[in-house]
UniProtKB/Swiss-Prot annotation:
It is an enzyme of class 6 (ligase). Pfam families: HIGH_NTase1 (PF05636). NCBIfam families: PRK13670.1. Transmembrane segments: none annotated. This is tRNA(Met) cytidine acetate ligase.
């Protein structure tokens, strides 16, 4: 048995994800696959289109063997923290052999080199980074510019790279996530072997509904603007279409950030600037801007655009909104940063090969798998707080769902993992 790990959001699972899954199995020579997937809130600070169990079902129906939930604390965080949480779960399972991710270049050695610079933080890089931050440039862009400065002084030919290729690499979101995965593997001294495959066709933020392969961003934008699922049938597997169609017909989605907007804005309007300043990632006077914009806006997207600036990216503002909604406090983030254990494998969907992964992990490690929350007792306060946040995220996400059956709370206690029985 050779087990492949994937770190995913599947919002929703589309043909590009299917290509990534199939090619990842080939390149890593894996027999079994486990995906660590975000739950109801995502890395860009947005709610998922449909609930996590349906998205996990999409993955298993398409060939993933086991889907575990990435705890909300990590799922709705920076690329660095998101990667740290997901890689830590794969590490603690004790059985994952490989991790494969998509990148625009498909050049693992170049990505490793960038990860090494970020880990070691050479003086020249730190000086450049500080300079760009002082110019008011947002951290992600400032870091990319500092890396470009650093590599422009190096001979990149030994990595099969040119300065132009390195600049292109550092500007792409998918490459940045890949670099963070490699950093997390290195910092945790992981035995998991990394691979990357070149993304096929549509770019990460492409908004074009191209033939066959398109981005999740394009799919979500199309649904937001038209609500027409039939026009994207060419870009998603049949099983994804069926699941989305069933969910939409039952008023289970699609869910967008504005559906939670009034809840979030009402929370912010009840706060003082001093209270807003205590929220994680708020600083340097941003609390005043948030306070003013909340009282000038009646839609969440309008509010986020109002707050956004050269220094504060839209994604950062969206994540701040979700932290307010979910009451994510700094002490828990600090605990998670320093925790080497305490994570868990919340099972969302699996098949018979997924069951084999679980059994092997239970033999090789003490990593806990959760099928039913009611039957799991957290071993410490950190784990309890992580799980409580996941439950709270589901309860609040449910408020955006029009279907009365799902809009009630406690869905985490009532919903069982999806099981796909393989034909023998």
């Amino acid at each position: 048995m050779r087990i492949l790990g994937l770190i995913t959001e599947y919002n929703p699972f589309h043909n590009g994800h299917l290509h990534h899954l199939q090619e990842s199995k080939k390149i890593s020579k894996s027999t079994h696959t486990v995906a660590v997937m975000s739950g109801h809130f995502l890395q860009r600070g947005e709610p998922a289109l449909i609930h996590k169990w349906a998205r996990a079902q999409m993955a298993v129906d398409a060939g993933v063997d086991l889907v575990l939930e990435l705890p909300t604390l990590y799922a709705c965080a920076s690329a660095e923290f998101f990667s740290h949480g997901a890689v830590s779960i794969l590490n603690q399972m004790g059985v994952v052999d490989a991790l494969c991710f998509g990148s625009e270049l498909g050049h693992i050695e170049a990505l490793k080199q960038v990860a090494t610079v970020l880990i070691n933080s050479p003086e020249s890089f730190e000086i450049s980074l500080k300079k760009y931050l002082q110019e008011g440039i947002a951290f992600p862009k400032a870091r990319s510019k500092a890396l470009i400065d650093h590599f422009s002084l190096e001979d990149l030919s030994s990595y099969g790279m040119t300065t132009e290729k390195m600049i292109a690499l550092l500007k792409n979101p998918n490459n940045i996530l890949g670099i963070e995965y490699l950093k997390a593997l290195a910092l945790t001294k992981s035995k998991i072997q990394p691979y990357t495959i070149t993304r096929k066709a549509a770019a990460y933020h492409s908004t074009e509904l191209t033939l066959n392969i398109t981005s999740a961003t394009a799919i979500r934008n199309h649904l937001f603007n038209t609500g027409n699922l039939n026009e994207m049938i060419h870009a998603i597997p049949p099983s994804t279409y069926e699941i989305l169609s069933t969910c939409f017909n039952k008023d289970g989605g699609p869910i967008f950030a504005n559906d939670l907007g009034l809840t979030i804005l009402s929370m912010i309007r009840r706060m003082t600037p001093q209270e807003i300043a205590k929220i994680l990632d708020v600083g340097e006077g941003l609390e005043n801007r948030i306070f003013q914009c909340a009282n000038q806006s009646n839609r969440l997207d309008e509010f986020c655009q109002c707050v956004k600036s050269k220094r504060y990216t839209l994604t950062r503002i969206q994540r701040i909104c979700m932290r307010i909604l979910l009451d994510i406090q700094f002490p828990l983030m600090n605990q998670a940063t320093h925790a080497s254990t305490g994570l868990y494998g919340r099972i969302l969907a699996f098949n018979d090969r997924g069951r084999e992964i679980i059994k092997l992990a239970q033999k090789k490690s003490s990593f806990p798998f959760i099928t039913k929350i009611n039957q799991y007792t957290p071993p410490n306060s950190f784990t309890k707080n992580l799980l409580d946040l996941d439950i709270r995220a589901t309860n609040l996400y449910a408020l955006a769902v029009k279907n009365n059956a799902f809009s009630k709370g406690e869905q985490d206690h009532l919903t069982s993992p999806y099981y796909r029985k393989e034909l023998t």
